[in-house]
């Protein structure tokens, strides 16, 4: 089982849409000039050194939010794992476009600021198609279905 962030290509997976969402925003140092803002808008991102996910679906999602070409942004690095991007942010290398609940900023030098207008994504529980489940996995899936 895994948790997938929409949009997702489900051609290889079965899934259950979860009743939860997460929102996009910017991970930055607490002393960054944008850290005092409550929200980050598209204009705020112009010319900033950005660290972005290297997934094409993410780029498409953010292009729609920007109402502009994603390639016009000043992308200085890409990431597969947000933890690695958070290390770059902590070193002052840029600002990471990411989801809210992936990096714990409590007691750290980093903070998260949501995008405005708000950009939310759905979450799905996914598993390989035609999967034969163990008793424990089968029980887990039935319990998730029961709870949602």
What are these language model-derived features?
Residues 11-17, 21-23, 83-130:
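Beta-alpha-beta core module
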Residues 43, 126-148:
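Extended ligand-binding regions for polar small-molecule ligands
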Residues 12-24, 28-50:
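Flexible hinge/capping segments at coil-to-helix
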Residues 3, 26-27, 50, 75, ...:
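Generic preference for hydrophobic
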Residues 31-41, 58, 117-119, 130-136:
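Short helix-loop capping/hinge motifs at secondary-structure junctions, enriched
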Residues 48-71, 133-137, 141:
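Secondary-structure junction motif
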Residues 1-8, 29-30, 81, 97-102:
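Beta->alpha turn/N-cap motifs
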Residues 52, 71-84:
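Short beta-strand-to-loop elements that line the ligand-binding cleft
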